[in-house]
Amino acid sequence: MTFPRAALSDLIGDFIVYRGLEPADQRLGGWSEFAARRGLPARSIPRKSEEAYAEVALAILAQAQSLRGCHGPLAQLLYLGDTRLLDGQAFLHMQERSGWPGYAFLASENLQAPAQSDREGSLWLANRWAILADFVAANPGNERTVVVVDLDKTTMGARGRNDRPLDNARAE
């Protein structure tokens, strides 16, 4: 089966926020604007697991929701990632700061074990990305639901499946 070439923007538009917390869509403010308003050094970009990261990310999400012209502010958070520690912490900080209900789906492929998922509160931990379909079915959203997708290498090389060649290429 052959698929045509596509870009991430075909799936999610320009509402992409880069690692430095700067959105692709220039209508959205990012870290540099946030830091300037607070008198913080622009070079001190918070890490994903820090509360300040969640604060900036939530501000960007609120701006994006406003640009979409939806009725009402965001009210639910769904998060997709591949690491229990970093993505799980980022989600929990975002959920705590926003007060929104939500769930995170965190998958790390392990093809040697039978497919399974476990729940730890609002975290779904899975060893197969295929289990994502169950997560989506159990957590329907609406126009006030934001879905945060940690794209790092997850979209190109799922942890435990195709991540080694990407790690090797980064090291070269």
Set out the residue ranges of the language-model regions.
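HAD-like aspartate-dependent phosphatase fold
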Residues: 1-172
